[in-house]
Amino acid sequence: MGKSEKEVATHGVRCFSKIKAFLLALTCAYVSKSLSGTYMNSMLTQIERQFGIPTSVVGLINGSFEIGNLLLIIFVSYFGTKLHRPIMIGVGCAVMGLGCFLISIPHFLMGRYEYETTILPTSNLSSNSFVCTENRTQTLKPTQDPTECVKEMKSLMWIYVLVGNIIRGMGETPIMPLGISYIEDFAKSENSPLYIGILETGMTIGPLIGLLLGSSCANIYVDTGSVNTDDLTITPTDTRWVGAWWIGFLVCAGVNILTSIPFFFFPKTLLKEGLQDNGDGTENAKEEKHREKIKEENRGITKDFFLFMKSLSCNPIYMIFILISVIQVNAFINSFTFMPKYLEQQYGKSTAEIVFLMGLYMLPPICLGYLIGGLIMKKFKITVKKAAYIGFWLSLTEYLLSFVSYIMTCDNFPVAGLTTSYEGVQHPLYVENNVLADCNTKCSCLTNTWDPVCGDNGLSYMSACLAGCEKSVGTGTNMVFQNCSCIQSSGNASAVLGLCDKGPECANKLQYFLIISIIGCFIFSLGAIPGYMVLLRCMKSEEKSLGVGLHTFCMRILGGIPAPIYFGALIDRTCLHWGTLKCGEPGACRMYDINSFRRIYLGLPAALRGASFLPALFILILMRKFQFPGDIDSSDTDPAEMKLTAKESKCTNVHRSPTMQNDGERKTKL
């Protein structure tokens, strides 16, 4: 019985001593971290409405993840390789769970969400409520009561979200650089592209789950369980609606903590893949030799750091690759972060529907592209130079295809006084004093409260009062306003709650946009793995962990942090009507000028991506001077060593420590 238990224990240890088991655990970590990140992005609009903050602040919250990552990335990427990498990854996953939990805290500390409305609670219960009354007292004006303004300070609770996202970023830091370097160190070189493709596939499965979770939570009212939803006068398509964003963060917290557990059972080092089948004597000898090498590495931590930094900074392909990545990250982060907001405004759909469509249409082709790209690299043993050309041409093809989305657009919502006149004539610019017209000047209406209604003439109005409606019947979302003096139609001049629908033609354009996105996502992801292998193979083996970390560091500080902030500020400039808080301060934007929004959302990323192809061309030219390991017999070559020209060799002629020389003896092939 004792022998049987010993065999089981030995089998358990062996299971955690294989690179494929680590790959499975790391893939789960990739799923959990991308699940959390995607869910966060899908809920940014809900957070914006919950706290009544502008898009620029939302961009700061989104960029705070990168700030947390930035605080540790260089330290973790270099010093982490000298420590226990699997345990550090496990700790990182647990910290991500803590950050997600902290993000959800404001919901439990704040009161109920109150959306702006012109409908008094009594009028919602009455079948004969007059909303347009001459010389009435405007009881719905923003309050000047100091106690109410103190309550309004609850909007500062978004700082919890900011800090939680920073902590989430700190926890995510060790997963990619340490996980990638661990696989690169102990996997066969020809299997490495496939393994990375599997990891990237995990990074698309996570977003798929995250978007589906976001879609479900966005359909649930934020205060579900504590309010009677039948009394609500808004629906998920309304820009004042706030979904139960906090539920998903609790789910993400639990998933991240569960994902962290397996990493605490993996050893610090593994045998190189393919050596496990050797005899016990050979296996033990190699393991002992590897342990001695690790001890030597730990003696020269800080000394090697500066040597590696100098070597990487003198690597032209590596430095240009960083430049390309920074430019493209600025483009892609902007596009992905604000895609739900753009599609909501462009096509008039709810957050829940948009997020669901993003997950359904865009993520499966990305997942398929990553997987096929990794399989192609493994099957055909594509050299680094060929991989660079494949990545370049596929990226360029997808970039040119993206311009088709410029014609898949819709017009602004027809809102009287904002985008059109009360006669239905479109306005080129927003003029605030046009909100009032002859048909509603005697109604004593509030001009800054957003409570839109749709008239049976096809025009929307900022409120039932501004539509000149004198009477309402029904309750909740079924309320109908009648006797509306501003609505000129052959019917009974009535209106219902909410903006008018943009029509079937606009809905068809959304489908065309999604089809183009499917093709574009597949093409781009197909070339992502070849492109990433260029980054990994242009560095020496001992530099890979630091190189990947430095690459991530530059993308975070020059792209991930500033991009959402300046992009959000530009989007704010396209706002036509801001929500109003209790103390009269502007809240979240209720409606954007979609034409200006479109030019910023599509135009700026297109310009940035276009600029990135110039240094990419320079890399293709520069690579002619290099001999990559995939182009020659790898059995006699350092895995990431490159033959440089005489001039370039001077830059990398640094004094190597014995540790670096020993690491350089490791043999791999592409």
From Swiss-Prot:
The residue ranges flagged as biased composition, category Polar residues, are 651-662
Q: Which UniProt keywords apply?
A: Cell membrane, Disulfide bond, Glycoprotein, Ion transport, Membrane, Phosphoprotein, Transmembrane, Transmembrane helix, Transport
Task: Name the GO terms of the biological process aspect.
Answer: cellular response to xenobiotic stimulus; monoatomic anion transport; response to estrogen; sodium-independent organic anion transport
Q: Which parts of the sequence are annotated with region: Disordered?
A: 649-670
Give me the Extracellular side stretches, as residue ranges: 41-59, 112-155, 225-242, 334-353, 406-513, 572-605
- TM spans, by residue? 21-40, 60-80, 87-111, 156-184, 204-224, 243-267, 312-333, 354-377, 382-405, 514-536, 546-571, 606-623
UniProt free text on domains: A conserved histidine residue in the third TMD (His-107) may play an essential role in the pH sensitivity of SLCO1A4/OATP1A4-mediated substrate transport.
Tell me the protein's name: Solute carrier organic anion transporter family member 1A4
**Organism from which the protein derives:** Mus musculus
The gene is Slco1a4
